[in-house]
Amino acid sequence: MIVSICILILLVCIYIYFFPFIPKQKKHYTYALLLGCPAHDDGTMSSSQIKRCNLAIDMYKKGLYGTLIISGSNVKNEYVEAEVMNTYIRKRVEIPTILETHARNTFENFKLSKKYIQEQDVLILA
């Protein structure tokens, strides 16, 4: 029993030596990019949209970013993803936002938002 405890302590010490704890740095990003997803066909928000918007609100309240870029077009139906999500967020908190309303997929979300982000670090919210 004592030998097992000693071996366990030794293994923990070895692990700590080779894999030390690195605290997460709380970084502030100039921009956060909120990736759009389709609303329901009747224009109501999908659960994915609501979850993503709530994540954006929470991260803003924690001070992790300054301006929110919401990216997404009307891919599945007539409702523009970025506009639907922006309406939801604006009813809950005032966040500086940029709407990118032409992206039709994730690749285009990044490509078309690049003009705003430039070379800045960005927080991706999905």
Listing of model-derived features with the role each one plays in the protein:
Residues 1-24:
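N-terminal type II signal-anchor transmembrane helix
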Residues 16-126:
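A structural signal for short, hydrophobic/glycine-enriched beta-strand patches
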